[in-house]
Amino acid sequence: MPVRQLPEIIVNRIAAGEVVERPASVVKELVENAIDAGSSRIDIFSDGGGRRKIVIADDGSGMTAADLALAVDRHATSKLDDEDLLQIRTLGFRGEALPSIGAVAKLSITTRHASEPHAWTLRVEGGDKTPIAPAALSQGTRVEVADLFFATPARLKFLKTDRTEAEAIREVVRRLAMARPDIAFTLAGEERAPVTWAAALPGAPGQLIRLGDILGADFRANAIEVRAEREGVVVEGFAASPALTKANALGQYLFVNGRPVRDKLILGAVRAAYSDYLPRDRHPVVALFVTLDSREVDANVHPAKTEVRFRNAGLVRALIVHALKDGLAREGRRTAANSAGSVISTFRPASMPPANWDWRASPSYPVGGSAAPSFAERAQAAFDVGAPSADIRPTEVTPDLLDRPLGAARTQIHETYIVSQTRDGLIVVDQHAAHERIVYERLKASLEANGVQRQILLIPDIVEMDEATVERLVARGEELAKFGLVIESFGPGAVAVRETPSLLGKTDAGGLLRDLAEHMAEWDEALPLERRLMHVAATMACHGSVRAGRVLKPEEMNALLREMEATPNSGQCNHGRPTYVELTLTDIEKLFGRR
């Protein structure tokens, strides 16, 4: 078969396959055009998941009759100069959206420019263009798209249900609305009540209002403002505290020069920044806006313009990690779970105990004997734990302690949780999780300073394990030594532990080494050294922390609370779980139906 030139209508339909994947793609392209036109209000309507009808109306600059005639031709655009491809400042620039839509649907455009005496309208059906004609419209542009993919019916087979396609449209509009809080958006149709996001003032306060309207009150309540700038690159936005997480990464909204994007580099940076705060199966909620010189980023990677390529990707990633870590650390204990609402929802009215119930027989009632001894003394511990603990009974509270953020310890329950009293409520602390974070932060600080102090064992601990595990540990010996854990091979199937971190005091060297070996087996060889060291620190902190089931004296409990107040990120343990839960008096009164 000889080589021949394809007809223009076929070329447009092929191009439409890249630009118009589904109804949401149409909405994205048309709303971006409205934003580029300087609109202050954009109304979106869809029906049948966008298959039957899509309408986008704006109050932007509109088009003249001459511009309208050219707008539906391929690669006709007002947004790009002859040699300006490396300095793209608009959301759209290819000049492909309108001709691509017109090639596969019934497209109608009505527009009015301020210089024109009246509006003009133009129709394109399956690539066939009609002459422009006068029309009635006060201002801006109104675009209607009907019977999407009627000219390419095979594409209809790949669309999802109307409900799914409508949700995809909603998500596209949400992302564009996040990027431009100064523009009012209305989304209607699909037999739903219209949703309106009013225009907000520019700057961070307006941005947070818009994000709260879209992402919900929980995000607004947990939002932490972040910002960092270096070498002309600015990262700003809001990140939710670790108290608000999702089971997937769908709550991460990323924008580059105002353009919503999906970028693995940025997603990886977000994950790295939260690595000290969240479990592996939870994901943070963030809205980050990266602004940089348009010459430093390539938006012309894909026809849909959802992917970008940075000239200095390392700088962007480092800046995102720095901005998020700085914001989370700055908030300190506020990153703890503000879970009073969820706690209250789990309570149910209690039934009265049977009449013959004997409170003396309750397992929680101490019957004779002394309390168990406290955990072993540690060389740099936050509090003295050398003597046996006293009986657990409510302690005297001094007024000044009630004013401290974590209040005054009143008692310990189930030998695991510390109950403290504040001026306006109470706090329940998980003693192991809290101390684990304290030890972890100390290990990190020591590593960044002069290294972790070691204690030499008079008699080395000999730990037996399989040869593969021994090889794995010895191979990482240099990294372990940075944390004060000095080991060496002791014949086949054994490791000698000669020094341990002073922070850990007396520790189970065998258990620690086995846990470290298990984690090392999961490491990817490409995992950066810093990440590997943090994994080691987290494992050591877990082993060096006070365990559940250890009875604490009142002064020990208060010392732990004070250490938490002075420790960064003490709201979560190293695995991302909350270290304490706070209940205000209002919350408690709700439990008893007083409010």
Swiss-Prot record:
One of its GO terms (molecular function) is mismatched DNA binding. SUPFAM superfamilies: ATPase domain of HSP90 chaperone/DNA topoisomerase II/histidine kinase, DNA mismatch repair protein MutL, Ribosomal protein S5 domain 2-like. PROSITE patterns: DNA_MISMATCH_REPAIR_1. GO terms for biological process: mismatch repair. It holds the Pfam family HATPase_c_3. HAMAP family: DNA_mis_repair. This protein is involved in the repair of mismatches in DNA. It is required for dam-dependent methyl-directed DNA mismatch repair. May act as a 'molecular matchmaker', a protein that promotes the formation of a stable complex between two or more DNA-binding proteins in an ATP-dependent manner without itself being part of a final effector complex. Belongs to the DNA mismatch repair MutL/HexB family. This is DNA mismatch repair protein MutL.
